[in-house]
Amino acid sequence: MKYVDEFRDGATARQLAARIAAEADPKRQYRLMEFCGGHTHAIFRYGIPDLLPANVRLIHGPGCPVCVMPIGRLDMAIELARRPGVILCTYGDMLRVPASGRVSLLKARAEGAAVRMLYSPIEALKLAQDNPDRDVVFFAIGFETTTPPTALVIEQAQRLGLKNFSVFCNHVLTPAAMHAILATPEARAGTLQLDGFIGPAHVSTVIGSDAYAPFPRQYGTPLVIAGFEPLDLLQALLMLVRQLNEGRAEVENQFTRAVTAGGNLKAKALTGRIFELRESFEWRGLGALPNSALRIREAFAEFDAERRFALEARSGLENKACECPAILRGAKSPRDCKLFGNPCSPDNPLGSCMVSSEGACAAWYAYGRQRQAVVAVAR
């Protein structure tokens, strides 16, 4: 398959791995964070850690939108779903994330709440059209990749004159989280040291490579945008190793077949018409971050579920035994959590990092648990 098979060639992968091993300075460490949850799974799926020298360490970041959703926002969604006359719909992973008291949207549905799973925001619009006597609320989550489809359905709802459709907006912004990672207590104390970023793929197709320019300039941290295939990731790692060896800190784009400097201008314009920055938004593991999320503009306030239903902010309590917040900051790995594997598993998730298909714990469970000893050496 074009643009797939040629990026999975085993011989080329071994050559790239050999170059990384040859060029990595044995006298120093290379601590590199992949921000994207899709990258995390690709790294384990293709056994990338097993190909790297011991001093090239991969650290998982907060690039999973389900994982970074704070419990308080999930509590608000559950409260909304339980209201008479409301149908709440969202993506499948969100249904299983435990909120306060280990209640999830799935459990709320079992107790009688009208909760629906969907694959696309357009399904929520259709649901509102088919149920004119019910208030249909789309629980919107995700980074810049999933924001334009939400903006589109809000615009369409206004055009159609739908009065029973609204959006509970929880769209968050990638650069803000990356800034926060470099300013966490662990980073300030030196217990979390990051030498470079593997930039996200899908997000970068929307926001473009220019969006990351502040990181080398402000923090001296290099960043290489990478695709999802094994050769993409290995080439990006080699590019980061070379930048660090040469004392450079730049934004480089390995994923040139999909990412441009300016990104998707139409998608960004659509997002800008419908949404504006929130002053602050709570992230699981990172706390309240300024200008890190979006809200619906006043011109589209009738489609804002928070305004329509006068939702009040909540502060949920984390499971104290769950290390998901520290894992999202890159301060710990899944194997550091005493709940990992037993009792916490994809069938019985106790934290969001095990629920989502993009979560670090789910990746470890699916691909890495049987190789923990090997991966531990690489770390």
From Swiss-Prot:
Keyword Metal-binding: yes
Protein role: Involved in the maturation of [NiFe] hydrogenases. Involved in the biosynthesis of the Fe(CN)(2)CO cofactor.
Cofactor(s) it depends on: [4Fe-4S] cluster
Gene assigned in the entry: hypD
Entry similarity comment: Belongs to the HypD family.
Protein's UniProt name: Hydrogenase maturation factor HypD
Gene Ontology BP, a term: protein maturation
Species the sequence originates in: Azotobacter vinelandii
Pathway participation: Protein modification; [NiFe] hydrogenase maturation
GO molecular function: 4 iron, 4 sulfur cluster binding; carbon monoxide binding; iron ion binding
Gene3D superfamilies attached to this UniProt entry: 6.10.20.100, HypD, alpha/beta domain 2
Residues the entry annotates as binding Fe cation: 36, 64, 67
